[in-house]
Amino acid sequence: MTVAEAAKVLGLTVLCGDDSREIEGVYVGDLLSRCMSRVTEGCLWITIMSNINAVAVAALTDPACIVFCEDVEIEEDMLQRARENDITIAKSTLDAYALCVAFHNSCGEKS
C-alpha cells in the first residue's frame, strides 16, 4: 500500500512529501531517542511528537511517512524542514490505536 492509498483509507491529510512511497510496516512511538533505533525505512511512523526533531529522526531513518495523530499542531518550520529533507508528513484526528486498527483492517489478508 502506498502513502496515498493509506491516506485515502485512513482519512489522513498529507501535508508534504512523496505520497507514492510504499509502506513496509508500522511503528508507533513518541520518545525520539527510542524512535531513532526503531523506525525503519519505508515504515509508517505514527506519533504525537510534533516538533522539528521528529524530522531529524526521519531524515536518519527514512520512513515512508510520519503521521501525526490526535490532530496535533504542526508548525510551518517543521514542514519546511521536512520539504528540505524529502520527508512525507501527514496528520490525522484519530489516536494511534485507532490508526493502527484501521491500517490493519485495510490490509485484509496481506497483514
What is each model feature region?
Residues 3-43:
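N-terminal first-folded block
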Residues 23, 33-44, 49-111:
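Feature captures the catalytic cores and cofactor-binding loops of soluble hydro-lyases/lyases
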